[in-house]
């Protein structure tokens, strides 16, 4: 979606986006190196998402995440590198540190 938007510093209000049918959120903000904050996306419906791989990877300027603890990640099988190269102070909910794996045929 916004992958590799290296000059992107802020986003419009994307909190009301209908994400209920989204299956892949992988790389959504990957490479947005100047993005300093995100709108409140805590109410996004993520019950159908299967991949969040590299979602926030290389977001060097991102200092905090919205409260994504509300997200339903029951179907997510790939969270590899979800916050790779982000600041150590980024508050990542514990449940997002578990990588679920699945075999695809």
Task: State each model region's role.
Residues 1-105:
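Negatively charged
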